[in-house]
Swiss-Prot record:
Bilayer topology: Multi-pass membrane protein
Designated name of the protein: NAD(P)H-quinone oxidoreductase subunit 3
A biological process from GO: photosynthesis, light reaction
Annotated family: Belongs to the complex I subunit 3 family.
Reactions that this protein is recorded to catalyse: a plastoquinone + NADH + (n+1) H(+)(in) = a plastoquinol + NAD(+) + n H(+)(out); a plastoquinone + NADPH + (n+1) H(+)(in) = a plastoquinol + NADP(+) + n H(+)(out)
Amino acid sequence: MFVLSGYEYLLGFFIICSLVPALALSASKLLRPSGYAPERRTTYESGMEPIGGAWIQFNIRYYMFALVFVVFDVETVFLYPWAVAFHRLGLLAFIEALVFIAILVVALVYAWRKGALEWS
């Protein structure tokens, strides 16, 4: 008997997962237009020609707002399954969710007091 008798489907899955992107990339390379017009090399931004250079420094406040957004977006990802299964999980899961929310509220208050949420 073959040693890997239960893994043929897994091997086939990995082969298909490797071939599909390779075939898609090859097909797009074969079917794309070959000529390049000078307009194709220009920067396109919302239908308007950009003014100034592309290498400008952004304010660090954008980073802070994005970081706070990601934290609370991840919170939503964790709390949604908990809310769906709330009735089946019991009291311990409720207390764990309260601790999780409390930690995030403490982090939000800390960021607020440090001025991370103020623009000026």
